[in-house]
Amino acid sequence: MIISHSRKFVFLKNRKVGGTSMEFFLSKYCSGEDVVTPIGEEAKFLPQSLQAEFGREIRFQNYRSFFNHYSGVKARDMLGHDLWAQYYTLTFERNPVSKVRSLFYFNTADVSEEGDPVADFLDTTYPGYLSDAFRYISNDGMIVDLVGNYDRLNEGFETICRRLDISFHGEIGFQAKGWQSAGRKEFTIGPTLRQEIADAFALEAEFVPWMAIEGTRPICSASRLAR
């Protein structure tokens, strides 16, 4: 997470959207008064194009009481509602099906093909685990100015950089990781699992229309409370 007082923006970091690389890019434009939370073990998952720079330019500072994947509601309460309203608040999301598939390939990167890795994954992981709604939706509705689309990353960052008066040269320096390698088990998502994912991400789809899963209609209430 980043709270930049110098450029007046807040970046909330969701999961499985390349958030570490986004955080790295934005942190380079932060000053000494800004909050930049540590990313810990996530540093080893930075794309190779950024690993050489990591640790030399990014500064983890002023982060006491803040955490990397922090709830937007808690961050707003700590920052103050007045400043939150003044700052440009942003985060990124991705299609829920793509998000679950990404987690499967990430978690099973070193798993043997023996047995059924897909079944094992679904036995231990439920779709709602990846819901990040509580980071940018509160009981009062959406609390951020922008939920960028991971699949339109460069377009989103062009808008962000223009708003923050940051130089942008067409990309932020990384591309989505390809966890699936030749010969690995394919993660097939059938109608039943698609519906389960749609139910788990019903709240997100209510506020971020492009997160709705085509061909499904969530049967659970989308009014669950944000944490």
PLM segments and residue spans:
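Membrane-interface amphipathic segments in extracytoplasmic regions
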Residues: 1-227
